[in-house]
């Protein structure tokens, strides 16, 4: 009777376990990377909206200058070609009146991995601040 080598059997089992677990590990790693990218880009969009709104509430700023500041900030964040939209309430208002800047970026245009995960369709950064200046 031939004796079976126990090492050979264990080696085959390890390959089988690796083949079953490796795809799950790959999906987990890709999900972590994609969600990290999502949070990073969402922070950039929110920061751009906040900075543009801060610019818009200063006394001599106009709505057109505020929207141009959005373009500058989005280009600096490497989101200039992402197909984003920007809106601003009029900046030529009295002191104390609120000014709102909103930037919306379609997430499908800035995906990192393209891996099919449940992700939001848009990243939205909205900031509202009161207009500065003498009352």
Where do the protein language model's features map onto the residues?
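Small-residue faces within membrane-embedded alpha-helices
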Residues: 21-23, 27, 31, 52
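Catalytic tyrosine of NAD(P)H-dependent dehydrogenase/reductases that use a Tyr as the general acid/base
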Residues: 13, 30, 38
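Alpha-helical membrane and juxtamembrane elements of multi-pass inner-membrane transport
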Residues: 10-14, 26, 64-67, 121
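N-terminal leader/signal peptides at the extreme start of proteins
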Residues: 1-11
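Membrane-proximal amphipathic alpha-helices
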Residues: 34-45, 59
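N-terminal signal-anchor/signal peptide hydrophobic helix marking the start
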Residues: 11-24, 35
